[in-house]
């Protein structure tokens, strides 16, 4: 997290001449250190409720009481995420680390070494958007297979985003993976901040564009006599 802070702070300073910028009507300070907040603490801070021990049925009832839309395919992970998205995400304007995500939201992540039910993962949010995601990789093949099996059960319920059991990956882990971690960040979203752009297509080198609509009259004008016979 310290590395990420230093990189973001220095990049903003080099590009903009200072560490504070204005984007979307918000003044954002990139100078570290950034606020750190555990996932369930962030939810409790906004709602006053501790939902960390709720089972699936209790979470569904809780979501309904808060007018959060749910469906039968949602497991604990997606229900937790729905609550966080409703009450917390859009409120994280200043750079903020959300840490200690629940296991159900992080199927490839190593379990937290001292906090039961949580993982060694953080995400960085700025201006209500996720900008970076990082975690310790799960390198225990037995635990990883269990996570994949949990994902398969969600897929059977209708979750089209659930993972499948990756046999090749599990086999590779059985040969051994040293302690590993990594992070990635949305460079396009970050560039939007630096250039004060609210359209991501404006900062993509090769944005995906829909083909220009061609009218029926235009097509008829270019048909040959043989085409019309």
Explain the meaning of each model-derived region.
Residues 10-13, 48, 127, 137, ...:
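Short, well-ordered loop/turn and helix-capping segments at boundaries between secondary-structure elements
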């Amino acid at each position: 997290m310290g590395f990420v802070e230093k990189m973001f702070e220095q990049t903003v300073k080099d590009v903009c001449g200072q560490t504070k910028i204005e984007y979307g009507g918000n003044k954002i300070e990139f100078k570290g250190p950034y606020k750190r907040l555990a996932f369930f603490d962030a939810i409790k801070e906004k709602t006053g409720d501790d939902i960390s021990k709720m089972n699936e049925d209790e979470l569904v009832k809780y979501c309904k009481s808060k007018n959060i839309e749910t469906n039968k395919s949602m497991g604990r992970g997606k229900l937790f995420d729905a609550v966080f998205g409703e009450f917390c995400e859009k409120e994280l304007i200043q750079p903020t680390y959300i840490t200690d995500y629940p296991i159900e939201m992080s199927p490839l992540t190593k379990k937290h070494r001292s906090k039961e039910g949580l993982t060694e993962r953080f995400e960085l949010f700025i201006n209500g958007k996720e900008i970076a995601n990082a975690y310790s990789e799960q390198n225990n093949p037995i635990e990883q297979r269990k996570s994949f099996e949990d994902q398969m059960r969600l897929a059977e319920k209708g979750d089209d985003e659930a993972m499948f059991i990756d046999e090749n990956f599990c086999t590779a882990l059985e040969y051994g993976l040293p302690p590993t971690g990594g992070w990635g960040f949305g460079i396009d979203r970050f560039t939007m901040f630096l250039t004060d752009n609210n359209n991501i297509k404006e900062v993509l080198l090769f944005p995906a564009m829909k083909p220009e609509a061609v009218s029926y009259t235009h097509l008829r004008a270019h048909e040959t006599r043989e085409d019309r016979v």
